[in-house]
């Protein structure tokens, strides 16, 4: 079926929308409506209106038609090609009877009418982009998905745009520029709508960019506020009560004084991961990436705040209520951007609003999401760069010989720069009170080298060689684990030959669905870890599965297939094995693990149902 592409408009806001905004009408009319609608829709089991199911990022569905007793009867219902190859991260949305599908670059968007068997394309949209973005994309040309609110679909593009489309027609409503590819800035993360604002981050921590989050009015596209990850307090947007309960976590002025000179201006701290929101507290949460450069000795002189940090901000103003830095003066590229899951857990006999975060540095953190109080922090993978997180000051107790240095090849650091897990989100089941976590099992050698900044050019400053876990002793590179965050213990685990780069969905049917990088889509019993069903797909899976009810009231499970991402870059770009340091170390470890012989590129959506 051929669909005519809609020609994008120039960067502009509709005149009448601007006029309404000038009179203050749009915000007052839509603020409650957009937020109330999403809060209602996220609770409907049959729909999937946010990338991680809900504001709390639990990736838990109450659907149970497909369960441990009948999942063996799961069969392919239909599939859909996205028209793009390379890595397919994130997942589709299902709003009402329409599924919204996205692709890797060039960032196609499709609306599929599910009332037609099996579907009909309602509309298709492909943005006009600056192709220079492909050259400055760090770790594949991925996109982690769309957002929905108030009859609109919000998308980001690799070249730094945030675009609003009419959800029913695909008509472009507005678009704004948020990132500048000439500086090495891109956008790979999914936006999140909170109230009448769409929140957008930025990628490019390997190019000396300065991380930030922006809020844009969902009706006009006008920017409401911009909050930087480091720099002067008025640009980081610290609230008057910032970290008041735990000043040892940092305070005013730290965005500059914990850096040497003006290095903070090239300080990374990008914001390309997942965002969550607590409507009751009116705070949204996200993490920041590694500081720039990877060579820590060029940043010597302090903690480099606020890189590798969890932020809690007020969505109306962007002001930070609290922040907690996980890896001070990062020396290993341990980005802190992974998802913030917001369960209420029983802590010392009391129900507590928590934030649970599985960090690249290998530690799983439990914090009180009201104040940033650290409740627990234990390794969820093998860690040898730090002994523990101190109960005295909430900082890692480092093992000195594992801190990297310029001109020194520090060997056997675990985990590697890809982390105990990367952005692939974990899931939480309220049935079990446990977390289901896709993990990596890899270590590395790391040598800092002096980096010189040129706008738009790589600003890495490290040579990294990666290999399997436990200093190369293991024969597997990943695992899917069930984890008790409060006890800091694994309940069960499934060893996978490749890193698990697919964020699971867990269901009331007692199942967890996830994919592997060699293309196996699996369903496991959440209580035991037993694999109950699996299906080989056309390409490696780095997408996050979803589940929904179709118009026929049947439960479906959907997932993208399309290998890529950081670990899969050798396959996605067809890179030779000659230089094991290429792809920031990914090429060597991918060939060592045998990924290029296990899968090839793709770009397909697969949808399954009971036969």
Curated annotation (Swiss-Prot):
EC number(s) on file: 1.1.2.10
Cited SUPFAM superfamilies: Quinoprotein alcohol dehydrogenase-like
InterPro entries: PQQ_b-propeller_rpt, PQQ_MeOH/EtOH_DH, PQQ_rpt_dom, Quinoprotein_ADH-like_sf
Protein name stated in the entry: Lanthanide-dependent methanol dehydrogenase
Catalytic activity: 2 Fe(III)-[cytochrome cL] + methanol = 2 Fe(II)-[cytochrome cL] + formaldehyde + 2 H(+); 4 Fe(III)-[cytochrome cL] + methanol + H2O = 4 Fe(II)-[cytochrome cL] + formate + 5 H(+); 2 Fe(III)-[cytochrome cL] + a primary alcohol = 2 Fe(II)-[cytochrome cL] + an aldehyde + 2 H(+)
One GO CC annotation: membrane
Binding site for Ce(3+): 206, 290, 333, 335
Gene (name only): xoxF
The record's free-text note on cofactor binding: Appears to be able to bind and use several lanthanides. Binds one lanthanide ion per subunit. Binds 1 PQQ group per subunit.
């Amino acid at each position: 079926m051929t669909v005519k592409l809609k020609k994008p408009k120039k960067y502009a806001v509709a005149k009448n929308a601007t006029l309404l905004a000038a009179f203050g009408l749009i915000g007052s009319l839509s603020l409650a409506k957009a937020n109330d609608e999403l809060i209602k829709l996220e609770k409907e089991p049959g729909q999937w209106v946010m990338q991680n199911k809900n504001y709390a990022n639990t990736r838990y569905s109450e659907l149970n038609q497909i369960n441990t007793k009948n999942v063996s009867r799961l069969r392919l219902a239909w599939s859909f090609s996205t028209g793009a190859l390379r890595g397919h991260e994130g997942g589709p949305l299902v709003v009402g009877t329409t599924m919204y599908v996205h692709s890797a670059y060039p960032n196609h968007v499709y609306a599929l009418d599910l009332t037609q068997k099996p579907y009909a394309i309602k509309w298709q949209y492909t943005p006009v982009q600056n192709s220079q973005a492909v050259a400055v994309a760090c770790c594949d040309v991925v996109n982690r998905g769309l957002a929905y609110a108030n009859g609109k679909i919000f998308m980001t593009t690799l070249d730094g745009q945030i675009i609003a489309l009419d959800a029913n027609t695909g008509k472009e409503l507005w678009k704004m520029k948020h990132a500048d590819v000439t500086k090495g800035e891109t956008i790979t993360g999914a936006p999140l709508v909170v109230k009448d604002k769409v929140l957008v981050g930025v990628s490019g921590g390997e190019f000396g960019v300065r991380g930030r989050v922006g809020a844009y009015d969902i009706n006009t596209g006008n920017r409401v506020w911009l909050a930087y990850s480091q720099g002067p307090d008025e640009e980081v947007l610290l609230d008057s009560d910032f970290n008041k309960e735990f000043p040892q976590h940092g305070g005013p002025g730290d965005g500059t004084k914990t850096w040497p000179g003006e290095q903070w201006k090239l300080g990374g701290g990008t914001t390309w991961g997942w965002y969550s929101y607590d409507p009751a507290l009116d705070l949204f949460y996200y993490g920041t990436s590694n500081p720039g450069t990877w060579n820590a000795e060029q940043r010597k002189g302090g903690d480099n705040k606020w890189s590798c940090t969890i932020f809690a901000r007020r969505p109306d103003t962007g002001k930070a209520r609290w922040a907690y830095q996980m890896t001070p003066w990062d020396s290993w590229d341990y980005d802190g951007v992974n998802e913030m899951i917001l369960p209420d857990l029983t802590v010392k006999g009391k129900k507590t609003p928590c934030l649970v975060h599985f960090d690249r540095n290998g530690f799983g953190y439990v914090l009180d999401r009201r104040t940033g109080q650290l409740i627990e922090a234990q390794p969820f993978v093998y860690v040898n760069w730090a002994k523990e997180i101190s109960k005295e000051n909430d900082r890692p107790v480092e093992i000195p010989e594992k801190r990297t240095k310029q001109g020194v090849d520090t060997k056997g650091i675990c985990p590697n720069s890809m982390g105990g897990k990367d952005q692939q989100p974990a899931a939480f089941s309220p049935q079990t009170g446990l977390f289901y976590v896709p993990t990596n099992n890899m270590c590395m050698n790391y040598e800092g080298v002096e980096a010189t900044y040129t706008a738009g050019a790589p600003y890495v400053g490290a040579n990294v060689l990666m290999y399997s876990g436990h200093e190369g002793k293991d024969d597997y590179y990943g695992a899917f684990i069930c984890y008790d965050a409060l006890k800091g213990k694994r309940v069960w685990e499934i060893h996978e030959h490749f890193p698990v780069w697919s964020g699971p969905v867990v269901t009331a049917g007692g199942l967890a669905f996830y994919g592997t990088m060699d293309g196996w889509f699996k369903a496991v019993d959440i209580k035991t870890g037993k694999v109950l069903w699996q299906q080989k797909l056309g390409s490696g899976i780095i997408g996050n599965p979803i589940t929904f009810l179709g118009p026929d009231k049947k439960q479906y499970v959907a997932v993208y297939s399309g290998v890529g991402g950081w670990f899969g870059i050798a396959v996605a770009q067809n890179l030779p094995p000659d230089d094991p340091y290429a792809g920031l170390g990914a090429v060597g470890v991918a060939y060592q693990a045998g990924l290029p012989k296990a899968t090839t590129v793709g770009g397909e959506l697969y949808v399954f149902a009971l036969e």
